[in-house]
Amino acid sequence: MSASKSSPIIMLVDDDEGHRLLITESLRSGGILNDIVEMQNGQEALDYLFRRDGYQDPVRFPKPGLILLDIKMPKADGYTVLEQIKTDAWLRVIPVIVLTSADDQVEVNRCYALGANSYVVKPVRYEEFQRRAKALGLYLDVLRLPD
């Protein structure tokens, strides 16, 4: 079963291919059916998100309903991406769950100050993601689950 055309995509931004694979597998094993668009670094995510003409063609460039964002990446780190998203009138409504490799309270506080909606410590476990998504009220509104 695949995501319906009306289900928002989930954008996964992480420079580590292994992490992207594990996160995607975790979400899939938990029953998430949304299409997941993977970005290899922060700059790639910004290029996609700020491609305004893309929103005129939502089939080719769908606006994410949720962004899962790593912090430590080359080119543009997660802080930069988060700040750009949350200061843009068009994008700031997209919920962002930050992915951190350590439960570092300073890092978490900085992410919240920049506008993060939640955070999950890697490796991402479906149960933790589900709990955070539910807390944000996203579980039924954004995520596509099996019927």
Language-model segments: residues:
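Non-catalytic signal-transmission and effector/linker regions of two-component phosphorelay proteins
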Residues: M1-M11, D16-V37, Q43-L46, F50, ...
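Residue-level signal for the "D+5" position in two-component response regulator receiver
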Residues: E38, K75-A76
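Receiver (REC) domain active-site loop signature in two-component systems and cognate sites
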Residues: I71-M73
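Short, conserved "switch-loop" micro-motifs in signal-transduction and mechanochemical regulators
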Residues: S101-D103
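Short, glycine/charged-rich "phosphate-handling" switch motifs in NTP-dependent
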Residues: N117
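A Lys-centered signature of the CheY-like receiver
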Residues: K122
